[in-house]
Structures are given as structure tokens and as C-alpha cells.
Amino acid sequence: MTLIAGLGNPGPKYENTRHNIGFMLIDLLKDSNFKDVSSAKFQGEVFKFNGIILLKPTTFMNLSGQSVKAVRDFYKPDRIIVIHDDLDLSFGAVKFKKGGSSGGHNGIKSIDNLIGNDYERVRVGIGHEGDAKNFVLGEFSDEEKKALDEILAYTKNAVCELLKSDINEISQKFTVKKGLIK
């Protein structure tokens, strides 16, 4: 069983912000086959199908670990994949990583504090301009919006391939270092 957690902040205020790219990808991965198995104990929206659990924590980003831990403790997945935004990567860049530091990402820090860092990460670049907090909580620019569908589709495909493969192989095949904006 594999748990895929997409990080973001709950509520309409944050729906289209850069910090919610993990939520956007979970929404793309979830099709009509997935059954909603959400429960208050999970502190998140949880969907399950064919050995795959999709999670969107309903905690705020800084507390994402509580939701990931609750789902992990209940379902005991063999594999955990976390999808999140990354300020240190250019907009549209996609990188894959297992373990390592949080890179200052508060959602990743929260997960690391509660379950350790022995899980796979799909890092989606959002770039960085000015104050980090305002930037991640801001909506995508018009130029970014034009490329967002392509970036999300590419990353969704990479995650689907990751489910069937090893992170090192997928990293070699799908890593995008410079972003997808042309």
C-alpha cells in the first residue's frame, strides 16, 4: 500500500496559491475509482483505491505531519510519497528525493518531526520572489497560470510512473531542473 500526501492549506482562501500545488496534484490523481474514506481522526481528506491512499491534510501546512502520521499509523503503508511546493526550485522544475532535510519547508518539517524523513518527496518548483511567506501564500502570476496545467500534467504522469518504479529511476527520467516555462 502507498500513501501519497499532497501538501497545502485548507479553505477557499488558499485554493489557488503556490503553497497548494500538492493539493492540486492530489485532485488530479484522484479519479472516480477512489472512495472517500475521510475521518476526523485523519485530519484530512482521504481517498483510497487499489492499494493507493491519497491524502490532503485539513490542518494548516505547519501541522501537516499530524495528518500524515494519523493516516500512516492507521493504514501502515509500505511507501509514503509527499508532494509539495519548493521555493528553491525555479517555477515548473520537478525533482525527486528520498529523505534529507526539509529545506525550510514547514510542512516537511512537521512530517519529519512526527514520522522521520524516510519517505519519498516530489518537489515542484514555484520559484521565489521577495518575502517567502507572502510569495508562497500568493496566487500564481498570469504567466505562471499559462504553464501550470502543463506542469501539473507532467508531474501527475511522473507520480503515476513513480508508483510503478524506483525513485532513482524516476528521478533520472523525469527531473526537470530549469522549469517548464518556455
Swiss-Prot record:
GO molecular function terms noted in the UniProt entry: peptidyl-tRNA hydrolase activity; tRNA binding
EC number: 3.1.1.29
Binding site for tRNA: 14, 60, 62, 106
Annotated catalytic residues: 19
Main location: cytoplasm
Site positions per UniProt: Discriminates between blocked and unblocked aminoacyl-tRNA: 9
Catalytic activity: an N-acyl-L-alpha-aminoacyl-tRNA + H2O = an N-acyl-L-amino acid + a tRNA + H(+)
Domain of life: Bacteria
Subcellular location(s) per record: Cytoplasm
GO cellular component terms given for this protein: cytoplasm
Site, as annotated: Stabilizes the basic form of H active site to accept a proton: 85
Keywords recorded for this protein, A-Z: Cytoplasm, Hydrolase, RNA-binding, tRNA-binding
Pfam short name (any one): Pept_tRNA_hydro
Any one GO biological process: rescue of stalled ribosome
Entry-linked PANTHER family: PEPTIDYL-TRNA HYDROLASE
Subunit structure: Monomer.
Family: Belongs to the PTH family.
Protein name (database record): Peptidyl-tRNA hydrolase
Organism the protein comes from: Campylobacter concisus (strain 13826)
